[in-house]
Amino acid sequence: MARRNKAKKRTSPDSRYGSVLLMRFINIIMKCGKKSIAEKIAYSALSLAEKKIGKDALSIFETAVENVTPSIEVRSRRIGGATYQVPVEIRQDRAISLALRWIARATSAARKKSGRTTVYCLQSEILDAYNKCGGAFKMCEEKYKMAEANKAFSHLRF
């Protein structure tokens, strides 16, 4: 039997800061179901960032995610044998998910490149996103550049 409405996501807030956003991020960086290790990594990185800047760790994290969150993306649309990249607005939930994934991916890339610990790389990536630079912010800028380049096809919206 079909649902009338889409089921709401039930993400509980994290234990230390009471933030649903931070728990979503912990779930993204978690590997092989080891949530306690993912929590240690996230909390350690946030406490290092808090010491470095001097502001509340949760506000630093929320600002970093906000700076990396895209508002537009391109989707492929096939019309008459040709495929066009059509810029469309993103739902808020998907935009935040993209931002969190980009921060995690940039952290992983920095860790492989530099050989430093995950905590240090995550802390530096959060601070980079907070200061509007770094790998995750670069991914966000690439989304905007693609949308800007394909602005002519915006009339082909879904």
From Swiss-Prot:
One of the primary rRNA binding proteins, it binds directly to 16S rRNA where it nucleates assembly of the head domain of the 30S subunit. Is located at the subunit interface close to the decoding center, probably blocks exit of the E-site tRNA. One of its GO terms (biological process) is translation. It comes from Wolbachia pipientis subsp. Culex pipiens (strain wPip). GO terms for molecular function: rRNA binding; structural constituent of ribosome; tRNA binding. This is Small ribosomal subunit protein uS7. Part of the 30S ribosomal subunit. Contacts proteins S9 and S11. The gene is rpsG. The keyword rRNA-binding applies. NCBIfam families: rpsG_bact (TIGR01029). Signal peptide: none annotated. SUPFAM superfamilies: Ribosomal protein S7 (SSF47973). One of its GO terms (cellular component) is small ribosomal subunit. CDD domains: uS7_Bacteria. Belongs to the universal ribosomal protein uS7 family. Keywords: Ribonucleoprotein, Ribosomal protein, RNA-binding, rRNA-binding, tRNA-binding.
